């Protein structure tokens, strides 16, 4: 082991034996002495979490039509422009996607409309 390695091991062992208060004091001294900030390392470590993109496209899924199938069929027709037969088939085939790849506001609005008609709806 070289002299530099020995010094590093000794320093590490000394730090390991310190109390938390002493370690915090050491950090403060090192920040002042070397003009660095321990917070910068935390900010760099947090950066990858910000890289996660917010979802922009949503699917509205009809899980069940509930007690009022007719009202749900009407709501599906109004929202999708489907004919009566197609809307009825979609509702009866639940769970089924009503609309796919729409923005959050439209998805929330459609969910509210379908729930008011009595449907059980999910957004993914």
UniProtKB/Swiss-Prot annotation:
The record's annotation in SUPFAM superfamilies points to:
ClpS-like (SSF54736), Ribosomal protein L7/12, oligomerisation (N-terminal) domain (SSF48300)
Annotated keywords: Ribonucleoprotein, Ribosomal protein
Among its keywords, does the record have Lyase?
Answer: no
Name the Gene Ontology molecular function terms of this record: mRNA binding; structural constituent of ribosome
Cellular component per GO, a single term: cytosolic large ribosomal subunit
For this protein, the record's Pfam families field holds:
Ribosomal_L12, Ribosomal_L12_N
What GO biological process terms does the UniProt entry carry, in alphabetical order? translation
Q: What family, per the record?
A: Belongs to the bacterial ribosomal protein bL12 family.
Q: Which PANTHER family match?
A: 39S RIBOSOMAL PROTEIN L12, LARGE RIBOSOMAL SUBUNIT PROTEIN BL12M
Question: Quaternary form?
Answer: Homodimer. Part of the ribosomal stalk of the 50S ribosomal subunit. Forms a multimeric L10(L12)X complex, where L10 forms an elongated spine to which 2 to 4 L12 dimers bind in a sequential fashion. Binds GTP-bound translation factors.
Function summary: Forms part of the ribosomal stalk which helps the ribosome interact with GTP-bound translation factors. Is thus essential for accurate translation.
* Name of this protein: Large ribosomal subunit protein bL12
Lineage, uppermost ranks: Bacteria, Pseudomonadati, Pseudomonadota, Gammaproteobacteria, Enterobacterales
């Amino acid at each position: 082991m070289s002299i530099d390695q020995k010094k590093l091991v000794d320093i590490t062992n000394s730090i390991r034996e310190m109390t938390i208060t002493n370690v915090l004091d050491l950090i403060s001294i090192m920040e002042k002495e070397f003009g660095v900030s321990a917070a910068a390392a935390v900010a760099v470590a947090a950066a990858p979490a910000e890289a996660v993109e917010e979802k922009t496209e949503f699917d509205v899924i009809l899980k069940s039509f509930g007690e009022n199938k007719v009202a749900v069929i009407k709501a599906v027709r109004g929202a999708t422009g489907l004919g009566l037969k197609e809307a009825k088939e979609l509702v009866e085939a639940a769970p089924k996607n009503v609309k796919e790849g729409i923005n959050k506001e439209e998805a929330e609005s459609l969910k509210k409309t379908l729930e008011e008609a009595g449907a059980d709806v999910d957004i993914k």
